[in-house]
Amino acid sequence: MEHYLSIFIKTIFIENMALSFFLGMCTFLAVSKKVSTAIGLGVAVVVVLGLAVPANQIIYQAILAPGALDSLMGITDPKESIDLSFLSFITFIGVIAALVQILEMLLDKYFPALYQALGIFLPLITVNCAIFGAVSFMVAKNLTLGESVVYGVGSGIGWMLAIVLMAGLREKMKYSDVPNGLKGLGITFITAGLMAFGFLSFGGISL
């Protein structure tokens, strides 16, 4: 249990997708103007990551990993071992795209206001670097199915936390006297950098 809790906390604070690895920054900067919209997109990312990471883990270990199909094909010679890992990227993107399409249809039917607010950025989750990055890290870390579920959900919550914090700060900055040369993306980049420095302080925690 402690092992899974350690993974969960690390993915939220120490290995935050947005503020530690700077993944998914295009959506992070574009949709962080309002807290309500940021929360909606954040929840969508949590759902997609919570499903995409373990789903791709199952597919990778069962089909794509080197030697995964050897027993099924009756191969005993290591020289003839089947390795489909070169199909990982396109397979991962396909799974993510399918999950995003399902989520998009559900939001359109049950939460039309949120669907309209997210606009083009909802289908762009398909190519969100944070989603693909978490799946790639899952393979690199060789996580089990249980670890993948925790890692996916934790990564999503970490990204959601970052975008909601950014949206809250940007809403407050509307009432601030920002220099003309820094208005818009200028002050937003500076704010994101300062937030990243803040999250760096969690790096000293040993889990």
From Swiss-Prot:
<keyword id="KW-0812">Transmembrane</keyword>
<keyword id="KW-0520">NAD</keyword>
<keyword id="KW-1133">Transmembrane helix</keyword>
<dbReference type="Pfam" id="PF02508">
    <property type="entry name" value="Rnf-Nqr"/>
</dbReference>
<dbReference type="GO" id="GO:0005886">
    <property type="term" value="C:plasma membrane"/>
</dbReference>
<feature type="transmembrane region" description="Helical">
    <location>
        <begin position="11"/>
        <end position="31"/>
    </location>
</feature>
<keyword id="KW-1003">Cell membrane</keyword>
<comment type="subunit">
    <text>Composed of six subunits; NqrA, NqrB, NqrC, NqrD, NqrE and NqrF.</text>
</comment>
<keyword id="KW-0997">Cell inner membrane</keyword>
<comment type="function">
    <text>NQR complex catalyzes the reduction of ubiquinone-1 to ubiquinol by two successive reactions, coupled with the transport of Na(+) ions from the cytoplasm to the periplasm. NqrA to NqrE are probably involved in the second step, the conversion of ubisemiquinone to ubiquinol.</text>
</comment>
<dbReference type="GO" id="GO:0022904">
    <property type="term" value="P:respiratory electron transport chain"/>
</dbReference>
<dbReference type="InterPro" id="IPR003667">
    <property type="entry name" value="NqrDE/RnfAE"/>
</dbReference>
<dbReference type="InterPro" id="IPR010967">
    <property type="entry name" value="NqrE"/>
</dbReference>
<feature type="transmembrane region" description="Helical">
    <location>
        <begin position="149"/>
        <end position="169"/>
    </location>
</feature>
<keyword id="KW-0406">Ion transport</keyword>
<feature type="transmembrane region" description="Helical">
    <location>
        <begin position="86"/>
        <end position="106"/>
    </location>
</feature>
<keyword id="KW-0739">Sodium transport</keyword>
<dbReference type="InterPro" id="IPR050133">
    <property type="entry name" value="NqrDE/RnfAE_oxidrdctase"/>
</dbReference>
<dbReference type="GO" id="GO:0009276">
    <property type="term" value="C:Gram-negative-bacterium-type cell wall"/>
</dbReference>
<keyword id="KW-0830">Ubiquinone</keyword>
<keyword id="KW-1278">Translocase</keyword>
<feature type="transmembrane region" description="Helical">
    <location>
        <begin position="185"/>
        <end position="205"/>
    </location>
</feature>
<feature type="transmembrane region" description="Helical">
    <location>
        <begin position="35"/>
        <end position="55"/>
    </location>
</feature>
<comment type="similarity">
    <text>Belongs to the NqrDE/RnfAE family.</text>
</comment>
<keyword id="KW-0472">Membrane</keyword>
<keyword id="KW-0813">Transport</keyword>
<keyword id="KW-0915">Sodium</keyword>
<feature type="transmembrane region" description="Helical">
    <location>
        <begin position="120"/>
        <end position="140"/>
    </location>
</feature>
<dbReference type="GO" id="GO:0006814">
    <property type="term" value="P:sodium ion transport"/>
</dbReference>
<dbReference type="GO" id="GO:0016655">
    <property type="term" value="F:oxidoreductase activity, acting on NAD(P)H, quinone or similar compound as acceptor"/>
</dbReference>
<protein>
    <recommendedName>
        <fullName>Na(+)-translocating NADH-quinone reductase subunit E</fullName>
        <ecNumber>7.2.1.1</ecNumber>
    </recommendedName>
</protein>
